[in-house]
Amino acid sequence: MASLSSSFLVLFLLFQNSCYCFRSPLSVFKRYEESTRSLSNDCLGTTRPVMSPGSSDYTLDIRMPGVTPTESDTYLCKSYRLPVDDEAYVVDFRPHANMDTAHHMLLFGCNIPSSTDDYWDCSAGTCMDKSSIMYAWAKNAPPTKLPEGVGFRVGGKSGSRYFVLQVHYGNVKAFQDKHKDCTGVTVRVTPEKQPQIAGIYLSMSVDTVIPPGEEAVNSDIACLYNRPTIHPFAYRVHTHQLGQVVSGFRVRHGKWSLIGRQSPQLPQAFYPVEHPVEISPGDIIATRCLFTGKGRTSATYIGGTSNDEMCNLYIMYYMDAAHATSYMTCVQTGEPKLFQNIPEIANVPIPVSPDMMMMMGHGHHHTEAEPEKNTGLQQPKREEEEVLDQDVHLEEDTDWPGVNLKVGQVSGLALDPKNNLAIFHRGDHVWDENSFDRNFVYQQRGIGPIQESTILVVDPSSSKVLKSTGKNLFFLPHGLTIDRDGNYWVTDVALHQVFKLGAGKETPLLVLGRAFQPGSDRKHFCQPTDVAVDPITGNFFVADGYCNSRIMQFSPNGMFIMQWGEETSSNVPRPGQFRIPHSLTMVPDQGQLCVADRENGRIQCFHAETGNFVKQIKHQEFGREVFAVSYAPGGVLYAVNGKPYYGYSAPVQGFMLNFSNGDILDTFIPARKNFDMPHDIAAADDGTVYVGDAHANAVWKFSPSKAEHRSVKKAGIEVEEITETEIFETHIRSRPKTNESVEKQTQEKQQKQKNSAGVSTQEKQNVVQEINAGVPTQEKQNVVQESSAGVPTQEKQSVVQESSAGVSTQEKQSVVQESSAGVSFVLIITLLIIPIAVLIAIAIFIRWRKVRMYGGDIDHKSESSSVGILGKLRGKGSGGLNLGTFFATHKGYSRKGFDRLSTEGSDQEKDDDDGSDSEEEYSAPPIPPAPVSSS
């Protein structure tokens, strides 16, 4: 027995060693083998902040940590955390770059870098959250200088906590000597508050299509500006190969003033604005990108690869610190009528000499002498530039304690100018079937108004209540809106009134409607639901409401201007008809007002000034109801629907929508609790979304993150991100039962090899999720490009369940690239044979010893001579080796595992636990009661 134990110990060590020698195929996907590095000795500088003598300012060296790119057109990223958490300001940039090695570099600000590695391939992204460019350097381009008293805000509650440096290495020949590169930038940071805050205004196209062969194609973007005045002082343009010139203008009273104009084929750094121009509320920021389709044989779309195109204009500005915004976007296609008057200079390409193109060596530009190679086989590289991110997914912030706030029915949400969250709730009052009579008159006046504060302003991070108001004012609160001055606009469906409350004031500044008196004239409302305020004109709009089905517009002091809308008269509602206009949101850069037409299950948008219908957004996923809608800068609408009626299967969830075309970009649900009646939604500029529920009495916070199966761009191939550990499962229950099944599988494999026409390919079979974002999509896959027989081949396949001739088979496989680093098939077979050989040798030895000691009579004591050694191994002899008995003598051993594997029908068997939820999943839902049009 001691000898047997020693043998098993040796086998264990052999298998353990073989496991250590096995190189996981997942290592192919790791960005870099070295997770941490320090600055190379060849690099000058320090990773620590350097204090300025006699000043509280300090400098940070943000550099590559001694890298040696091995491929041309490599993009590498490096993150640096701000050394302090308090608010600070970046006031100067000093580049450290050699034009012979680095093509260009960009410095981003964000809060969540895409990687925690010391540096990484930027094709995996720069940041997980929203990022903005602070600085850009390109060879032969002038440096960016911030004006005196201007700084980028970092740290604190609203600023970026991380810097992410991106360096594009153009020609790898510069690294033939294997030197280490430390390209980067030194930033000077001060804790002193700056009177002017710098920011970036991004104007970009999301839907341009460039037909093949067209000589000139225009991409026009224009947005109405409605924020406080900004002062542009630098600009940067960006397109890919087809861009000829990008021009940006301010349009004021029909007059076009140039902000900046440049060829995107020249170094793409920030260039100074030549003629100072300010942009004020009411101005239009207009951008035109001039493209050519010459040389293309198919249409070109907006996208992130070099074979796609982009139309981006970055305007670096400064504005007064009191109401500064560090990042703004415009993605709206310009009206053709507006661009009829664009200056002709926007249609004239800026010539770029061939010498300049050669000198730039940009990976996206190809001259006639150097055409694109292998375009049919190679995936296009991606570049880190701003494009409408349609891979972002909203997930509940499960660490946010606000979901546990003790509130009543949550009817309204809004964000104040400081991005604090305001919650409008009903305290101990409840809207039910006894609240109103058939004439919409409130029946519970006797209980008095809500005695607690109905408006709570909470910190968006900690959910700490910062202030509260609204005691003894309201009976059944409904909608809440906060204007740019911090005033609260609320509605009360019991009072049939609209209120304007000043920040910090208990007495209303303005009251419209007659208390407890429903009506349909200009001085009455009937259960008004929501208010929206135009940030430019100050005019406000009232959704009225549950019983009037109209939108009313008033001047800032409450004078009636106009109204539109009528009750839906058929099963197919026409534009401008409503069945409970329940929620309003302004789209200020388009001058539009969007309405959640609740019981018609759609969103309608109108020109705010005229009330003319523009468009509707309606999807089957909405179901029968859309409760609330909210617009966020950047062209995104957020909405929530209601519980499905009987016969409808649409789940209760939130939606992220592309405002331009109405497409659904994402859906989201809570991780804690469940949506019951999500009643209102509020979206912040950074993509954070809050949802309030009138039945669950809760508020959820959702934060943007990459989708669970997010696309990770690696080495020119888009793959699904894989976790470090993957379980390789062997389904013994699914194995073929007969030799006939094995023969069928062998024939199928041989047939596949014949079809491959000499190209050896491994099937990649991890689940693939294809994302269609309105631009040419690339299949996201857990596939690594293989080269076999000299021909690179990719197979993009989803996992399928193979069934053949009565055999149920499910193969769950992870691709292992066959290489010298892996374990060969021969070695595996050898390791499997060794223990069998050892056991046979042990049995022979035991047999030999017994024969020597007791003689040949032992063969007849317990078995026939025909059984032989195999009989001993099966445990038929008292002196033989019984494997079951041997293992069963060990502590903790159970035979259940062996018994289960030996069951013939195991692939049809099912544990009791496996089906515990089956009845609940597949049973028909009960018929719900008729919905009550309340809340």
UniProtKB/Swiss-Prot annotation:
Chain segments carrying region Peptidyl-alpha-hydroxyglycine alpha-amidating lyase: 391-712
Protein origin, superkingdom: Eukaryota
Catalyzed reaction equations: a [peptide]-C-terminal glycine + 2 L-ascorbate + O2 = a [peptide]-C-terminal (2S)-2-hydroxyglycine + 2 monodehydro-L-ascorbate radical + H2O; a [peptide]-C-terminal (2S)-2-hydroxyglycine = a [peptide]-C-terminal amide + glyoxylate
Glycosylation sites: N658, N739
Known EC number: 1.14.17.3, 4.3.2.5
Biased composition (Basic and acidic residues): 728-751
Binding site for Cu(2+) B: H238, H240, M310
Note on cofactor: Binds one Zn(2+) ion per subunit.
Biased composition, class Acidic residues, residue ranges: 909-922
Secretion signal span: 1-36
Transmembrane annotation, as ranges: 826-846
One GO CC term, this protein: extracellular region
GO molecular-function terms, A-Z: copper ion binding; peptidylamidoglycolate lyase activity; peptidylglycine monooxygenase activity
Pfam families per UniProt: Cu2_monoox_C, Cu2_monooxygen, NHL
Protein name: Peptidyl-glycine alpha-amidating monooxygenase A
The gene coding this protein: pam-a
